[in-house]
Amino acid sequence: MTAPQNPLERVTLRNPIHFLALGLGSGLLHPAPGTWGSLVGVVLGALLLPWLGAKTFFILTALCFFLGIWLCERTSHDMGVHDHGSIVWDEIVSVFLVLLAVPQVSLFWCAAAFVPFRLFDILKPYPIRYFDEKLTNGFGIMVDDILAAGYSILVILALAHFI
């Protein structure tokens, strides 16, 4: 029996590693699975941040980052493709980080976190593209989105200053 040619045939949502790496299944939505994963991150973050508080939410985000290195590496390996578009755990965790910079959890500020993050994640300005191309492991999958989150946080801080 030969291995499946489609990388998505090599993963299953019944596997908890794949389920998390694929963003609770959101990475299987089309078009633009990264956008769907980011939206899941905004919704989860908007629910968890007020409930946990900023300090605990930051700790959770850091733990999710380190867990994500392993989840994304394993799932990429299982798929036979580095950073397949359906792997969106990195988007979810990075949006969590952006939400930590918003002055309040509201529809406006959630959108203000979501939009620049997606733009930076898609456009990949320097050094995001460099790390995206050079680091071909779980850390690489996670770090390019964390850098996009960093740029997004700068946008949030500027926006908060002027509003």
Where is each model-derived feature located?
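Short, surface-exposed acidic-centric catalytic microdomains
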Residues: P31-L44, T56-C72
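Strongly charged, low-complexity linkers/loops
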Residues: Q104-A112, F117-K124, I128
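Alpha-helical transmembrane segments of multi-pass membrane proteins
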Residues: A46, T61-W70, L99, A113-I122
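Helix-coil boundary and interhelical linker segments in multi-pass alpha-helical membrane proteins
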Residues: G45-I59, V98-A111, L157-I163
